Curated annotation (Swiss-Prot):
Binding positions for Cu cation per the UniProt entry: H241, H291, H292
UniProt subunit comment: Component of the cytochrome c oxidase (complex IV, CIV), a multisubunit enzyme composed of 14 subunits. The complex is composed of a catalytic core of 3 subunits MT-CO1, MT-CO2 and MT-CO3, encoded in the mitochondrial DNA, and 11 supernumerary subunits COX4I, COX5A, COX5B, COX6A, COX6B, COX6C, COX7A, COX7B, COX7C, COX8 and NDUFA4, which are encoded in the nuclear genome.
Protein name: Cytochrome c oxidase subunit 1
Lineage: Eukaryota, Metazoa, Chordata, Craniata, Vertebrata
UniProt remark on cofactor binding: Binds 2 heme A groups non-covalently per subunit.
Positions annotated to bind O2: Y245
One of the GO BP terms on file: mitochondrial electron transport, cytochrome c to oxygen
Mitochondrial intermembrane side stretches: 42-51, 119-141, 214-228, 288-299
Main location: mitochondrion
Molecular-function GO terms, alphabetical: cytochrome-c oxidase activity; heme binding; metal ion binding
Amino acid sequence: MTFITRWFFSTNHKDIGTLYLIFGAWAGMVGTALSLLIRAELGQPGTLLGDDQIYNVVVTAHAFVMIFFMVMPVMIGGFGNWLVPLMIGAPDMAFPRMNNMSFWLLPPSFLLLLASSTVEAGAGTGWTVYPPLAGNLAHAGASVDLAIFSLHLAGVSSILGAINFITTAINMKPPALTQYQTPLFVWSVLITAILLLLSLPVLAAGITMLLTDRNLNTTFFDPAGGGDPVLYQHLFWFFGHPEVYILILPGFGMISHVVTYYAGKKEPFGYMGMVWAMLSIGFLGFIVWAHHMFTVGMDVDTRAYFTSATMIIAIPTGIKVFSWLATLHGGTIKWDP
């Protein structure tokens, strides 16, 4: 098998997982370089970069690189691809060629994001890309359009990956293995994939409407034509809040395995509680998004609902922390590195 065949046309979950890990490590260095620019600018009085726009471009790029090209490829693409098939005893992922496509959509997406910062004035919108700042007046030129296309590609990659993980985790188990016997990391990736599948299409709709507002004279987010910038915020945060749970849920799964192993236990404390806590967090994550929008003004009853729904997420989260501590309790903790 030639180098090209193995690494470019791979249908092997381990090779694709390795590609994700290498890509994520490289993107992580780019993201770290961007954060060093931010710290250098903020580390002393006066200016270093000299311009607010370039600073905002660096902050925006840092966020996108770290979220979409470091954390998600490593935790879902890397660890997910490597571990999910092994943990359920499957020969590979359910759709190996789609798995390869999910990976190879990421480098072009990354290229588009980097391109957005090198043309015109860059996309200095923040990772939320709110209009009217992201509109074609405040951000004339191709920068924001390139950033939107980058998000489109990364989104398609994640949706395909999510379909693959959901199908694999549910359908590729041996007949004797029930869903309640799969390891917690498998559960965490499954729930993460469901969140991706349900939230990303909404982001895609929002940024596509922004794209047409910028280029095709629509007014989805322009009050002059009967639109409303707050609509964009609802669409974005309906994705954006589940996204932060997408970033942490695989970490929950990893922590459960790490804590169990280093406590010298054969299983985590409260397996079913852990599973249902993750399911609850995933579900509740979809009905709390407007707490990111309190400053735009909201009806008192709406504020009361979103506040209390948000606080309820603390309960399953507390169950998880309690169970990790209970797993450690009474164990022979291994202190080796």
